Structures are given as structure tokens and as C-alpha cells.
């Protein structure tokens, strides 16, 4: 799985990168701003993206998520300590992983979302730390 990390805190981005690569996935880039994320979306292909709501250039994560989801066809997971800043429609993202998160919660979220992406439905229990958008809960038959 090719994964893009959009996170402006270098330590957090590095930890997330280590977790992703430890699971055997490829990190195609790390962006700290919406501008960098849009550039990476043009030059790389990602299947999954972790997108912080608040980036170095402001509250731009929702715009990045919508672009990645709708234009680049990536599945997006928001990472944020402020879930109330996520729009009601989740900006087309599949869900939210609330900070601070543990290594276990990231690994569980990735495994769950990858299963859903590959099969079109959930094969395992949704991780407690992952809040799914209503659209993805319906799509992945999480009634």
C-alpha cells in the first residue's frame, strides 16, 4: 500500500512513517503544508493518506483530504486532536484517528481500512480509536 503522510509536526510525521514502514507499506511522501500535499498528489500515487486537519499553513487539512479523495482517488484518514474541526461530511475522508494516538491504534486503523479497501466491507471489528464517516460506515457495511 502506498501511503502519503500530511503532518506538519516533524516528530509526529516521523513516528507515523516508522509505523507505516514497519507494517510493510511504502511512504510516498511527507507534507507539512497543503501546498506540499497538493504537489505530492500530482507527482505520486497514493492509496491511503493520513491528513492532519491543522497544517503549517492553517486549517487546510479538509481541503487536502477532499482533493486526495475526490481527485487522486485515495482513501483518507484524518489525524487530529481537534475532531470538531472536521466538516460534517468529513471532506470525503473515511474517518478520524484522534491524537494523541498509540502505535497500536495506528496499526489497527491501517489494517481495518486496508481490509475494507480491498474487500469493500469490514472483515474485522472497527478499531475503537477510529471514527468512521457515515458515508464510509455505509459503504463498508458497518450498520
Please give the residue ranges for each predicted region.
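Conserved acidic carboxylate
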Residues: 7, 80
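Short amphipathic alpha-helix used as the core "switch/output" element in two-component signaling
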Residues: 59-74
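Receiver (REC) domain switch/active-site region of two-component response regulators
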Residues: 102
